[in-house]
From Swiss-Prot:
Region (Disordered): 86-121
Protein source organism: Candida glabrata (strain ATCC 2001 / BCRC 20586 / JCM 3761 / NBRC 0622 / NRRL Y-65 / CBS 138) (Yeast)
SMART domains: CHROMO
PROSITE patterns associated with the record: MYST_HAT
Gene label: ESA1
Location within or outside the cell: Nucleus; Chromosome
Protein name: Histone acetyltransferase ESA1
Length: 446
């Protein structure tokens, strides 16, 4: 098996007496939530007393990484130290020499196995290859995944930045205290502070409450600095041009990076439009979430980055953002898809949205419909539609063609959707025309 060949290099277990002996890349047992978890030391801050250690819990999401003090590290158990680089190279060379023995025999066995699999039921098309190249069920390392990221849009190839240690401990926005998930390139003077204050309306950042309150008294802005293109009794949407509102959009990118890992946001915001969702009260329009969109996307993406702030998550706002992005695509007369790769939370949200839209359309349409017709009605790409149908397990191969089969589970899910009181975007309240940019307006300075 190919997977058996990939082995993690074992470290050197060692008993230590003090946390002063702990080094970066060591693995040790750390107390968290009344249990001990194996964690890797990513950084050490010796400028404070007592020293703090930035840890990543092995096999857990990166957003759980945190700073811990030495008293949470269990020194009764052995600490695993990384092997010296020279020893690693010697071990790697030995393994490569072993792999060179009998390579042809292994290859023949593998090819025979593949040919026997293809021989049976070869008249059934493999749905994994239906216009969905690049989404195979394969395991790739984090480094390989970073190399595959796009270098246009909201992505850049910078593995060092992706691996940064989270640098802010806590932010306060309005009445909410929020713990950031990831690194964001805020000014270095803010990184040693216990709390950073971020204004609810301008997204400007401050190192002290006094600075923030003085600024708030003078600032009159009470909504995102753009055109309000949608309003209902629940939310509003504003369209902001990154070229016209650089400072506000850069502040938005800094805030977003605290909660987005895969996406590495450009500091140059000129190529993007930002669509910001707000909730209104007597104070003004409070920022809830947003998605950005390239003014001219060569890949046909209708979303570059999408985020609902943590204090508003699990309240249906993310779904409204997704729905709104497709309403814009319908107005443009185009199909669209979010920029890949999506974050884990983003992927779950999109899959749920695509599934619900397709189930509702297929049940209520009640007639034969092609994939292209579904695409034109929903503005979803055929790739996203086929993936979703495959995930729902309702795409069948029958008499030489693919058909969509609505089983009892799908009908039951449709009935459940109808009983849910979800909010939706009212297309009639969208006052917007697709912006048109000249060649000079799309010429961005670098």
């Amino acid at each position: 098996m190919a997977g058996a060949e990939v082995e993690e290099e074992a470290g050197i277990p060692k008993k230590i007496e003090s946390t002063e002996e702990v080094l970066i890349k060591c693995q040790c047992w750390v107390r968290k939530d009344e249990e001990e978890r194996l964690a890797e030391i990513l950084s050490i801050n010796a400028r404070v007393s007592p020293s703090k250690f930035y840890v990543h819990y092995v096999n857990f999401n990166k957003r759980l990484d945190e700073w811990v003090t030495g008293d949470r590290i269990n020194l009764d158990k052995e600490v695993i130290f990384p092997r010296p680089k020279r020893q690693l190279e010697e071990d790697t060379n030995k393994k490569q020499k072993k792999k060179k023995k009998f390579p042809q025999k292994a290859a023949v066995v593998e090819s025979d196995a593949k040919s026997s699999e293809m021989g049976e039921g070869s008249d059934v098309m493999d749905l994994d290859n239906l216009n969905v190249r690049g989404l195979k069920d394969e395991e790739i390392s984090r480094e390989d995944e970073i190399k595959k990221l796009r270098t246009s849009g909201s992505m850049i190839q910078n593995p060092h930045e992706v691996a940064h240690v989270r640098n802010l401990s806590k932010i306060i926005m309005g009445k909410f205290e929020i713990e950031p998930w990831y690194f964001s390139p805020y000014p270095i003077e803010l990184t040693d502070l216990d709390v950073v204050y971020i204004d609810d309306f301008t997204l400007q950042y401050f190192g002290s409450r006094k600075q923030y309150e003085r600024y708030r008294k003078k600032c009159t802005l009470r909504h995102p600095p753009g055109n309000e293109i949608y309003r209902d009794d629940y939310v509003s949407f504003f369209e902001i041009d990154g070229r016209k509102q650089r400072t506000w959009c850069r502040n938005l990118c800094l805030l977003s990076k605290l909660f987005l890992d895969h996406k590495t946001l450009y500091y140059d915001v000129d190529p993007f439009l930002f669509y910001c969702m707000t909730r209104r009260d007597e104070m003004g329009h409070h920022f809830v979430g947003y998605f950005s969109k390239e003014k001219e996307s060569a890949d046909g993406y209708n979303v570059a980055c999408i985020l609902t702030l943590p204090q508003y998550q699990r309240m249906g706002y993310g779904r409204l953002l997704i729905e709104f992005s497709y309403e814009l695509s319908k107005k443009e007369g185009k199909v669209g898809s979010p920029e890949k790769p999506l974050s884990d939370l983003g992927l779950l949200s999109y899959r749920a949205y695509w599934s619900d839209v397709l189930i509702t359309l297929l049940v209520e349409h009640g007639k034969e419909v092609t994939i292209d017709e579904i695409s034109s009605m929903t503005s979803m790409t055929t790739t996203d539609i086929l993936h979703t149908l495959k995930t729902l397990n309702i795409l069948r191969y029958y008499k030489g063609q693919h058909i969509i089969f609505l089983n009892d589970d799908i009908l039951e899910r449709y009935n459940q959707l109808k009983t849910k009181k979800r909010r939706h975007i009212d297309a009639e309240k969208l006052l917007w025309k697709p912006p048109v940019f000249t060649a000079s307006q799309l010429r961005f300075a670098w």
